Amino acid sequence: MKTLDLYGYTSIAQSFDKICISIASPESIRAMSYGEIKDISTTNYRTFKVEKGGLFCPKIFGPVNDDECLCGKYRKKRYRGIVCEKCGVEVTSSKVRRERMGHIELVSPVAHIWFLKSLPSRIGALLDMPLKAIENILYSGDFVVIDPVATPFAKGEVISEVVYNQARDAYGEDGFFALTGVEAIKELLTRLDLEAIRATLRNELESTSSEMKRKKVVKRLRLVENFIKSGNRPEWMILTVIPVLPPDLRPLVSLENGRPAVSDLNHHYRTIINRNNRLEKLLKLNPPAIMIRNEKRMLQEAVDALFDSSRRSYVSSRVGSMGYKKSLSDMLKGKQGRFRQNLLGKRVDYSGRSVIVVGPSLKLHQCGLPKKMALELFKPFICSKLKMYGIAPTVKLANKMIQSEKPDVWDVLDEVIKEHPILLNRAPTLHRLGLQAFDPVLIEGKAIQLHPLVCSAFNADFDGDQMAVHVPLSQEAQLEARVLMMSTNNILSPSNGRPIIVPSKDIVLGIYYLTLLEEDPEVREVQTFAEFSHVEYALHEGIVHTCSRIKYRMQKSAADGTVSSEIVETTPGRLILWQIFPQHKDLTFDLINQVLTVKEITSIVDLVYRSCGQRETVEFSDKLMYLGFKYASQSGISFGCKDMIIPDTKAAHVEDASEKIREFSIQYQDGLITKSERYNKVVDEWSKCTDLIARDMMKAISLCDEKGKYNSIYMMANSGARGSASQMKQLAGMRGLMAKPSGEIIETPIISNFREGLSVFEYFNSTHGARKGLADTALKTANSGYLTRRLVDVAQDCTVVEHDCGTSGGVVARAVIEGGVVVATLDSVVLGRVAAVDTYNPVTGEKLFTSGELIDESKLDKIRVAGLDAVKVRSPLTCESKQGICALCYGRDLAIGDLVSIGEAVGVIAAQSVGEPGTQLTMRTFHVGGTAMRGVEVSNLIALMDATVKLVNSNVVTDKYGNQIVMSRSCEVVLLDAAGNEKMRHSVPYGAKLYATEGQSVSMMEKIAEWDPYTIPIITEKTGTIKYVDLIYGVSINEVLDESTGISNRVVVDWKMHLQGANLRPRLVLLDDNGAVVTLSSDLEASYFVPIGAVLNVQDGQRVHAGDVITRIPRGSIKTRDITGGLPRVIELFEARKPKEHAIVSDVDGYVEFGKDYYRSKRRIFIRPVDKSLPVVEYLVPKGKHTIVNEGDFVHKGDLLMDGDPDQHDILRVLGTEALANYMISEIQQVYRLQGVKIDNKHIEVILRQMLQKVEITEPGDTMYLIGEHVSREEVMKLNRKLAEAGKKEVSYVPILQGITKASLDTNSFISAASFQETTKVLTEAAFAGKEDPLYGLKENVIVGRLIPAGTGFIMNKIKKLAMLDQSDYATYYNSELRGIMGDLGSSIIEEFQTPAPDGSISGSVVDY
């Protein structure tokens, strides 16, 4: 503990448990003050000494110089504590000028602007008066009746000056009591009886039925209760005395030219003192009331400007050309405010920065530090060593020696930096790997050398990037740097658990070349070797080269120790690579007896880590890097223009596509397809053409030349070293389609590639996309950084607090299937999670794992063999720990590959993992040069394996051609394997043709279904005759003539705009041969409602067959998807905003019925529940929106009734927390997956947990809660336990979802919320509620200057609590709180403390320990 007190501050920071904030009473302000300030003088302009009685008065605030009074009579430490009888200054340290407050006694009270102006006005709410009325009383001279006595006025009524004068004439001076100005408000507030108001409001709340009035009453009631609970008095919101900040916090600094630079606060204080003194003199002269009122108003404005000059643009705060003066509020809020600038982001000493260069000869734990920098950074250490060795007798001489760079100094420097790690940081630090520790190696020059393998963690490159160096000073800091932050400890990425120390660029190319197999046409026979030394000799002599095919005798050791050998076909390069592999049974030669690309290399590093541990991995990575660099330079791979081979088939493909597009134009001109359908088809056709050319180009470029050598560019892209297939496509294939800045795709593609060169027109077309990319980057970087900040803020107090919370809850993990393809297997979803229940093999009944067991790589085989399709695992969402989560609910710490440690700050890690790729991706939007990245629309379903078909919800009809047409909106095709396990599940849209029947066997690549992706059809279920109902030409349908084709279509238009269209419900009705309306299988009439924009395919009176398309609704033209579309989506999800056009979700299982329209704009849909006891649910859908259900359809709870994204709040309300979590995870992961970024689900779950912390009270039970109040879930559950024990009625509540910004501001800690956003509002609310900050989170503790309660600080906090206890309680506390973390080591120390001395007393204390 003594070392912690290194800088003397910590003792203050450690000596309290919580911080409370409240409104300061006049008495408390006077008690804090050391004296009243009446004079505006600051310093004497001749002597530059501070003036007595002024704003810098030493008598009030303390001496300017250490231990010296103003007149100079007392000048030494020995006089400390004496007050000079001549000048009245206490002799003490000048530091007190940072702590001692003064005050100004105001002649007239003023209202505090925060309580008056910050909306909603607190003073207004308490008095139940509108803000305008209060302002009129304060500034415009209106009167308020305090006591009506015998007059007809009401108490608290506001009357104008004219009415006041008339009333005074009528009723006399004592007829009634009314006041104006601040005194009136103060009097009203003083007379408030809060207890009586509370009782009245509670009665009102019970009797009122109006929702509006209820909300208003609840707000006022909450305010009144806060005042009662906190012990604040309402009249304290009116100031009669103002505190003055210590002078060293508002200093007077003289500039070079001798002019003083004054802090803005001094200006505000001077204005207040001036106006206050002037008012005091005026009052003695008994002037007219208007003069007094004006002077009081000016005083009020001056005080307002001091507290918050941004609220009203007062003249006083904008003095002439002096510009804006900063107020106290401005000093707190914003990026430059006290919280974010000085408390959360401090500047650090012992640091330097320089440009980085590559250090290929370094080991992973090393970095090259320039000698000049090291000399400066380690100066104090060198000084002490020089003095200790007697080389320099004094510190002054030691400094001189360092400056003149004497030879002795370098020897001492070498000794000092040995085993002393330094920290390297690269801005922006997006995740914790942006700050790592290294052992410094002294180098010449001025640039820092960085190990190539850590570049991806820092996201660094060597094009001029700079990095900062920091020196950890204390022993503890050095220990933490070495044990926790060393680059060798950061092998795995915390966001997905994959290695982040993986080779890239040149290294990959070198290893790829090393494992390549090139067939030399001239070599006929394959050489055979027995030993590696023979291979080396053959290589040296040029008999074989690195990539030749050879045979080699490979020795293999069996588990029992016997050695066997076998002949393998390989290359010398692969054998060279095999020499650096660690020896382990899981690492076989087969791993590298193949061409290694970046993907394989990553999985090898991962496997080495899992099999051999950290040390071996680090050594292996370094060796791998050296090999990669060596062979990349030996390979001679270069980038040549001739290497870009344009495929011969290009012209044919382009011609085919152009031909098809001409066909589409003809179809469009003949009126067979609509404009948007033609556009979509053209875009799709060009996408296909581009892909075909790219495929042929890859085929041509991947072949060896006549000498058996591979193409250099192909090697670079194929190995994953640089470039990608899409970039190669643009170099040698066809650039393809471009996107406009709006995101629309330009339908004329760029047919040329970069090798051929673009025409002027093509070049101009491509500038669109390129510029959009650059503009996007600039805008989105800021967006993504802000998202990360909000995520960190919402999750910062989420740490691992215990091993097991004891819950039996969890979530069901399943494989993720998108578009019929498994994008995340069950293995990858459950890896690193803890099983929530005992899990058995469904066939054999064998127990696979028990509840509470961590599922690691060794257990995954069991899951595969058992063919499980779902596993119930523990989740942060269902964890029941208080103030954090438990280790078992979180599972594996991805950065170390083992169960998470107690004290880990999982919230911050989750926020960084989700936020970091956002920034990365947004910085990279333009990498594909704006070419449109859009997949061809999926229009069919193909079996990807041999399987049996199972149909779910398949309502089909047979059309006139004998095709099976799907009529259900929720039809799914499930493919089962031979054992009957589900392998794939696809939803098939309404109107699709189905080629397979229930139970049919299909073979791989067989087509199961197909549909038109560009339109949504409406299909008849039975045969009959069509009749138009409410489809009136000119009102609800129009013939729309297509200008370019001259063909007209009947299109449904917005009938609400027409006078006659008020009550229309346009629909097509199906009649039988007798003219009666056909009844469908659901017992409903066959009437088909048509939305706005639908194109009618049938005439009135036309005969139709079952399965015919009678109407089609064109889908809008498709926009390109890239992360810039994705990032706002992620933000929308985390902020829990309603999507712009959100879909309506069904609340119950039931049947759909269409009701009568609601006015002109809405359409009624009823759902009649299956459960007859439930009421019918009614929904209002905007007219013209396409409902995806028909009358008579059966819908499940949670199904969508119309197109669009569902609202998350609806999902939570209807389906519950797990369904919401599944929806959010799948939506967020979809965005990241599109960019190839992998994030573990648990990070999203941690953020979600923070968003779900509050509940809404639906029934307060026997408590003081109000209906609709939002309370912390933990608080309610704790209260309910107490109520249950006492046999009282418990509180009922429903979970609510808060966006990350709202959740951050709603946190228990007002310090954390104030430092996030809306500082003044947060502090105002906290003050009148008398809030306490328990200091549980990381942010609050950083702000008050303590160790954070995570990691080492978590344990230190526990030990401090232990130190506070009686020694007899040590063991009990230790066993409950610390044994799980410190084990038996701690208990032996505690026994030592509790061993009685010979006289029976217990000596020693944990504090000493």
Curated annotation (Swiss-Prot):
What residues does Mg(2+) bind to? 461, 463, 465
Sorted alphabetically, the Gene Ontology BP terms of this entry are: DNA-templated transcription
- Binding annotation for Zn(2+) 1: 69, 71, 84, 87
Q: Does the keyword Nucleotidyltransferase apply?
A: yes
Give the cofactor note text.
Answer: Binds 1 Mg(2+) ion per subunit.
Under the GO molecular function aspect, what terms does this record hold?
DNA binding; DNA-directed RNA polymerase activity; magnesium ion binding; zinc ion binding
Report the cofactors.
Mg(2+); Zn(2+)
User: Which Pfam families is this protein grouped with?
Assistant: RNA_pol_Rpb1_1, RNA_pol_Rpb1_2, RNA_pol_Rpb1_3, RNA_pol_Rpb1_4, RNA_pol_Rpb1_5
- This entry's Enzyme Commission designation comes to 2.7.7.6
Q: Which reaction does it catalyse?
A: RNA(n) + a ribonucleoside 5'-triphosphate = RNA(n+1) + diphosphate
Q: Which SUPFAM superfamilies does the record associate with it?
A: beta and beta-prime subunits of DNA dependent RNA-polymerase
Record keywords, A-Z = DNA-directed RNA polymerase, Magnesium, Metal-binding, Nucleotidyltransferase, Transcription, Transferase, Zinc
- Binding residue positions for Zn(2+) 2: 805, 879, 886, 889
Superkingdom of the source? Answer: Bacteria
Q: Which GO terms describe its cellular component?
A: DNA-directed RNA polymerase complex
Gene3D superfamilies, per database record: 1.10.132.30, 1.10.150.390, 1.10.1790.20, 1.10.40.90, 2.40.40.20, 2.40.50.100, RNA polymerase II, clamp domain, RNA polymerase Rpb1, domain 3
**Assembly mode:** The RNAP catalytic core consists of 2 alpha, 1 beta, 1 beta' and 1 omega subunit. When a sigma factor is associated with the core the holoenzyme is formed, which can initiate transcription.
NCBIfam families, alphabetized: rpoC_TIGR (TIGR02386)
Q: Cross-referenced HAMAP family, in alphabetical order?
A: RNApol_bact_RpoC
Q: What does this protein do?
A: DNA-dependent RNA polymerase catalyzes the transcription of DNA into RNA using the four ribonucleoside triphosphates as substrates.
Of which family is this protein a member? Belongs to the RNA polymerase beta' chain family.
The protein in question is named: DNA-directed RNA polymerase subunit beta'
